[in-house]
Regions:
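RNA-binding accessory domains that recognize and position tRNA/RNA substrates
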Residues: 1-150, 162-212, 450-452, 459, ...
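ATP-dependent adenylate-handling ligase core
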Residues: 42-45, 177-318
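Short helix-capping/linker segments at secondary-structure and domain boundaries
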Residues: 66-79, 240-248, 352-357
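Hydrophobic positions on the alpha1 helix immediately C-terminal to the Walker A/P-loop
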Residues: 157-161
Length: 471
């Protein structure tokens, strides 16, 4: 198949195929080392799984190399956000990837995650295999059943998820799969996994580095990176399938997974969807089309972040300070403090305070103590104030005579949730009720924190911030 679309084609295939398209090459322009997955279990990756990782990396690289259009004042809702993406990629099983079902499933999950139109030209791969496929193993290393594979970011939610599994006597081996483009973040993940392992459970830590290389200019990279969730799910699936399990878990509180917009100017994928229930279902649809019957679940979806924190077993309290939430962590110089003003820092502080675990945090490691910065106001407190603005919008909807209808009016993206959580009319009705309960508990948590800080006085934001001008 030849792509006949006016958008430029990003060529990841072998050579130029006679049409003069420059090649975007592994190791020269980007790297991914999936060898740790094969080495952890003594099994080479299957052709189809290796292809899935190649597809994920091509998507990630294309996402980074094609800038989204800047938002002029005439386009306050950033309708020019979406792009047409055209990729030529060499795969080991082109017939599989050219099939109607696989194309449809791939386009559906990528379109939902990035709000871009993705077009692929799959050709036969002729490059040598990567080490994850080329190196044979004398003995397979099967994890002790029932093994659990979980995505592990090094944040609070994934720490609690891993700690609960380590603390559970009946659970088998725990496999933590981490993927990162930051050397420092991989070091933190390694440290946490080592500390978890020291508590007696077999913890297999699999870390997969990936990144763009110096052959591309960082100044030209797209920073939104909405495709990262696809990479994480692909690598997590590769680990689960290679380990011989049929389940993959990610650990994300429900408020973070739904990720409702804070402000009116945030439309569609301006809010990330990496852990959204629709993302998990669409990705599982793709896996089924590829003949991988993997179940992906989020056991913390019906909990707030504070409720997740409250489940942390006491013996792991000392690991809270090692975990990391700050959005700016990968870019920070070692030894520099957390920012304390990003939404991730603010929500972490709120959750630790509400759960009664704030004493476990070393607040001197923040440039500004998050809740104090929010109480004091100032120009750099707008992310936290945006969170409070969202809380007040939620409060108004939840106090209405028809709370679900009011919530849908305020946050139209909620409409997609019930059908991705439960099947059938009754199931969707139950899901709506549970979602309203989750949102009410979240609002009440902020009320309990507000009694001390008086944060509701800081809710007001200028119209140009709530309705446009802020990404």
């Amino acid at each position: 198949m030849t792509l006949r679309i006016s958008a430029p084609i990003l060529n990841f295939a072998d050579g130029r195929l006679g049409d003069g398209l420059p090649q975007i090459a592994w190791q020269r322009h980007y790297t991914v080392d999936d060898q740790p997955i094969a080495a952890a279990f003594g099994r080479v990756l299957s052709d189809r799984m290796a292809d899935l990782i190649d597809v994920a990396m091509a998507v990630y690289v294309a996402d980074r190399l094609r800038r989204r259009e800047p938002s002029p004042r005439s386009d306050p809702f950033r309708l020019g956000w979406s792009r047409t993406m055209c990729i030529r990629l060499g795969v080991r099983e082109p017939a599989v990837w050219r099939s109607t079902e696989v194309r449809a499933r791939l386009g559906a999950v990528l379109g939902w995650l990035t709000e871009d139109d993705w077009n692929f030209d799959f050709v036969k791969r002729t490059k040598p295999q990567r080490p994850s496929q080329a190196q044979g193993f004398l003995f397979a290393t099967a994890p002790q059943a029932p093994a659990t594979v979980g995505l592990f970011s090094g944040g609070l939610d994934s720490l609690v998820g891993a700690a609960e599994l380590v603390d559970r006597p009946s659970a088998g081996d725990l496999i933590l799969i981490s993927a990162s483009s930051s050397t420092r973040l991989r070091g933190l993940q390694t440290q946490l996994a080592r500390r978890l392992r020291s508590r007696g459970k077999t913890v297999i830590s699999v870390r997969v580095p990936f990144n763009l290389t110096g052959a591309t200019s960082p100044d030209l990279h797209e920073i939104s990176q909405r495709s990262r969730g696809f990479v994480f799910l692909a690598l997590g699936s590769a680990a689960a399938v290679t380990a011989g399990t049929t389940d993959l878990r990610l650990f994300e509180n429900g408020i973070g997974a739904v990720n409702l917009p804070y402000l009116e100017c945030q439309v569609g994928t301006h809010s990330t969807r990496s852990a959204h229930p629709a993302t998990l279902r669409l990705f599982m649809d793709l896996l089924r089309a590829l003949q991988f019957p993997l179940q992906i679940s989020n056991p913390y979806f019906w909990l707030t972040k504070a409720e997740v924190c409250s489940r942390l077993p006491t013996q792991f309290h000392d690991l809270v300070g090692i975990s990391e939430s700050c959005d700016g962590f990968p870019q920070r110089v070692e030894g520099q403090p957390r920012c304390g003003i990003c939404t991730a820092c603010v929500l972490r502080a709120q959750a630790l305070t509400v759960s009664g675990l704030s004493h476990l945090e070393d607040w001197s490691r923040y440039r500004r103590a998050p809740l104090l910065a929010l109480a004091e106001g100032g120009a750099d407190s707008w992310p936290g104030r945006a969170m409070l603005y969202q809380v007040e919008v939620l409060r108004s909807a939840l106090e209405a005579n028809e709370p679900w209808a009011a919530a849908l009016d305020a946050f139209p993206s909620l409409a997609r949730l019930p059908g991705n959580l439960e099947d059938g009319p009754l199931g969707r009705q139950i899901a709506r009720s549970e979602l309203l309960s989750l949102l009410r508990r979240y609002v009440h948590e902020w009320d309990s924190v507000n009694k001390v800080g008086g944060y509701r006085e800081r809710v007001s934001l200028p119209d140009h911030v709530t309705k446009g001008g802020v990404a």
